[in-house]
From Swiss-Prot:
The lineage of its organism: Bacteria, Pseudomonadati, Pseudomonadota, Gammaproteobacteria, Enterobacterales. It comes from Salmonella arizonae (strain ATCC BAA-731 / CDC346-86 / RSK2980). Poorly processive, error-prone DNA polymerase involved in untargeted mutagenesis. Copies undamaged DNA at stalled replication forks, which arise in vivo from mismatched or misaligned primer ends. These misaligned primers can be extended by PolIV. Exhibits no 3'-5' exonuclease (proofreading) activity. May be involved in translesional synthesis, in conjunction with the beta clamp from PolIII. Residues 4-185 form the UmuC domain. This is DNA polymerase IV. SUPFAM superfamilies: DNA/RNA polymerases (SSF56672), Lesion bypass DNA polymerase (Y-family), little finger domain (SSF100879).
Length: 351
């Protein structure tokens, strides 16, 4: 039986800001956007969350909920440095580390000799070490499979941990809401609820063939997760699939020249972000995204082996002319899809 830990830093970006500026600790703060510009909240601290401010919330909505919210632009170099330090702490216990983002990762500690082989003690020690060395707190979940470890890490936040032993799994799953399963969004959860399927216990009573018919491959995933099945390994070579940069605009734009000027400003940041990726990752495709003032969005990309500003501008112009109509544009984005060298042959054959 495997021993999987999911570590999730507590309101990470905001926590770094509060650590470096103690005056921010007891007031509502959020990273992302500004009072003058549109945007979305990246992270909010717990005082802000008491007002209902959440990650991915439009900044304007956050300010309505909490008018005295302090908005910070973000210091991503500081966040990356803290993330590297946390990753170094993980590596003292295992080489099987799968980062999901700067602030969370899975660890497989099945075969580690540390802490007498106890995943519970390892998680506790990792969290304490993070606090001692970085003055930041983390929460953790311990379970025999990845998805349960991730769910567990959210059950005793902040600065806590939750353990699901193999013996606990059946009872835990019986009452677990399907909406808690990673990958089950609001739309899927609503559809399941309309069928009388609310918990994993409900899915356990279902016929797999029916789930496959109604939900396709996702039906199998639902059935497996509801049985506690998750055979995915902790993948220390997990590939980053894409790199992108986008800008939500203070005012909608209606002229192509304005869009082109924004792309000119975004392109150096895309180059910078791409430079931080492992050098053996190649570009498979590059593309653009436009979001309109009716909140509809469109993405267009094509195969292109090298980052090329002129090609991105050409793609954006084509998208602008063919898909915008008379709508204003409120967001412009650039992105590249990455290709691992081992998969290059597969992509070429697939064309």
């Amino acid at each position: 039986m495997r021993k999987i830990i999911h570590v999730d830093m507590d309101c990470f970006f905001a926590a770094v800001e509060m650590r470096d500026n103690p005056a921010l600790r007891d007031i509502p703060i959020a990273i992302g956007g500004s009072r003058e510009c549109r945007g979305v909240i990246s992270t909010a601290n717990y005082p802000a969350r008491q007002f209902g401010v959440r990650s991915a919330m439009p900044t304007a909505m956050a300010l309505k909920l909490c008018p005295h919210l302090t908005l910070l632009p973000g210091r991503f170099d500081a966040y990356k440095e803290a993330s590297r330090h946390v990753r170094d702490i993980f590596s003292r216990y295992t080489s099987l580390i799968e980062p999901l983002s700067l602030d969370e990762a899975w660890l497989d500690v099945t075969d580690t000799p540390h802490c007498y082989g106890s995943a519970t003690l390892i998680a506790r020690e990792i969290r304490q070490t993070i606090f001692n060395e970085l003055q930041l707190t983390a929460s953790a979940g311990v379970a025999p499979v990845k998805f349960l470890a991730k769910i567990a890490s959210d059950l005793n936040k902040p600065n806590g941990q939750y353990v699901i032993t193999p013996a606990d799994v059946p009872d835990f799953l019986k009452t677990l809401p399907l909406a808690k399963i990673p990958g089950v969004g609001k739309v899927s959860a609503a559809k399941l609820e309309s069928m009388g399927l609310i918990t994993c216990g409900d899915i356990q009573q279902c016929d797999l063939a029916m789930l496959l018919k109604r939900f396709g491959k996702f039906g199998r995933v639902l059935w497996e997760r509801s049985q506690g099945i998750d055979e995915r390994d902790v993948n220390s070579e997990r590939l980053r699939k894409s790199v992108g940069v986008e800008r939500t605009l203070a005012e909608d734009i209606h002229e192509w020249s304005d869009c082109e000027a924004i792309i000119e400003r975004l392109y150096p940041e895309l180059e910078r972000r791409l430079a931080t990726v492992k050098p053996d990752l190649l570009i498979a495709r590059q593309g653009v995204k436009l979001k309109f003032n009716d909140f509809q969005q469109t993405t267009q990309e094509h195969v292109w082996p090298q980052l090329n500003k002129e090609d991105l501008i050409s793609t954006a112009r084509k998208t602008w002319n063919e898909r915008r109509g008379d709508r204003g544009v409120r967001l412009v984005g650039l992105h590249v899809t990455l290709l691992h060298p081992q998969l290059e042959r597969q992509l070429v054959l697939g064309l």
